[in-house]
């Protein structure tokens, strides 16, 4: 006689065990029709699952985040259904959900083409349009194995043999003649899976191990309705236009090549942006009372063993040997900063010490994960470490938070999401240390009135951390800034200071990064601005061009005036029509184009156009220089004349 408690606190009594869908039907036919699954006592369950005891129940529909994930997971099964009909010999591996969609790894004796993808998608839609029911059948482990043995599915058998207990009751989901195995839940009917798109095929090793067979991974996206799907595909198109790799090539910012995977070759214009970012951060370091240091990029293995990196981070570290000593190229700057702190006696009066570095770091990221500037092996971190007392934690973390928001606002990022990552399973330090560290960060966030999400187990091995994620113009989130509290590393490296009573205490170390990897941040802002960098970041801030050869000397005079004022400017004296020059520099996203004709020479002025095509009219040269300098000084995001 189960009593079902609903989210609003109301209760429904049933004489017999009842399914999730039957509870929904008792509430209303509209809700029953919309039911995808249920959350029983906090656990997601299929709509057909039976509730035998008193329970809480929340109905899951397509409006819920869980409902959308279930739709995507069921679309992966729908993909399996379709590809099995088109390619009966295909072997199915795994088909999980991912952000915004799903994928399925398949083993097929031919390479899938774009035409194949379109055919599979067409068959998926045909099947979904029949609105067939998805039937869940719990079976014994042996029955599941026998089923996949008969169907010739070696990967499903491997999952059963290696990942599922013999005493378990696996669930088989029947999509008409197609059978898949899953924890579920799944949609009860394919009418929920009508809005999807197959996107691409990529290679993927079985179990992610390069020693195993290479499979083909089919990626897709799925949404609750046509509007959501269309909006997502539109965002993808816009993201493709903004791809920093494409823009970086078009604007000649950088390149990468096979001989140095994950390493950036900065060209002049890209390096200009890089140096401007460094200069900007340096002004903030001075404002927030940091000292800037520089540590070695390679240190002996012995030091990395003391820090715990060798035991916890070795897979991501590049190593080398010399004179019978083993060295590691630093993946992060913190151990070097502790060495600098340890030089000379420190008193409590010296604290806090805020130590910053634009540190050149290297991490041996898997080659398959490398992605333009967003995921590299060699990068520069705008890193800092603050050595302080426990009493200073809240005020120092508060100052870090203020600095983060201060810097991000300069780039126009105002949607910032905060996450607190707590202790991972693989960590150093005692639990009481972690208790104090997590409490310290939590207190600082609360004191600053910040809402935050807790990410259990996502902290670094040496301490918990606050993460700051930026939401860009396409709604994507980029995790950049971090503030981490560390009681362990200073102790391991014998850092200490003299207290007021002349005893020795270990300082707390706060790890702080704001841009994170400068390389990655350039990738982010390249996509955010679509290459239309604000004038203070633009590699070339203005181009001065002539109409005929008779204005060449005047152009050079204007260029000199701008250059002497500290602006980045160049002349275009080519024997081309001025319209051609304007179009070319517009494509290069140069903020301002200054045109000099005979009239401008006579009046001692320049005609100014923006890269967005707006004609700003004529300016006295001195007046334009002052306006441009003001834009650079205040780091304006918009050009003159822009709303």
Curated annotation (Swiss-Prot):
Its EC number is 6.1.1.3. Zn(2+) binds at residues 334, 385, 511. It is found in: Cytoplasm. Its main location: cytoplasm. Binds 1 zinc ion per subunit. Keywords: Aminoacyl-tRNA synthetase, ATP-binding, Cytoplasm, Ligase, Metal-binding, Nucleotide-binding, Protein biosynthesis, RNA-binding, tRNA-binding, Zinc. Homodimer. SUPFAM superfamilies: Class II aaRS ABD-related (SSF52954), Class II aaRS and biotin synthetases (SSF55681), TGS-like (SSF81271), ThrRS/AlaRS common domain (SSF55186). CDD domains: TGS_ThrRS, ThrRS_anticodon, ThrRS_core. One of its GO terms (cellular component) is cytosol. Belongs to the class-II aminoacyl-tRNA synthetase family. InterPro entries: aa-tRNA-synt_IIb (IPR002314), aa-tRNA-synth_II (IPR006195), aa-tRNA-synth_II/BPL/LPL (IPR045864), Anticodon-bd (IPR004154), Anticodon-bd_dom_sf (IPR036621), Beta-grasp_dom_sf (IPR012675), TGS (IPR004095), TGS-like (IPR012676). GO terms for molecular function: ATP binding; metal ion binding; threonine-tRNA ligase activity; tRNA binding. It is an enzyme of class 6 (ligase). Residues 1-61 form the TGS domain. Its cofactor is Zn(2+). This is Threonine--tRNA ligase. Gene3D superfamilies: 3.10.20.30, 3.30.54.20, Anticodon-binding domain (3.40.50.800), Bira Bifunctional Protein, Domain 2 (3.30.930.10), Threonyl-trna Synthetase, Chain A, domain 2 (3.30.980.10). Catalyzes the attachment of threonine to tRNA(Thr) in a two-step reaction: L-threonine is first activated by ATP to form Thr-AMP and then transferred to the acceptor end of tRNA(Thr). Also edits incorrectly charged L-seryl-tRNA(Thr). Pfam families: HGTP_anticodon, TGS, tRNA-synt_2b, tRNA_SAD. Residues 243-534 are annotated as: Catalytic. SMART domains: tRNA_SAD. GO terms for biological process: threonyl-tRNA aminoacylation. It catalyses: tRNA(Thr) + L-threonine + ATP = L-threonyl-tRNA(Thr) + AMP + diphosphate + H(+).
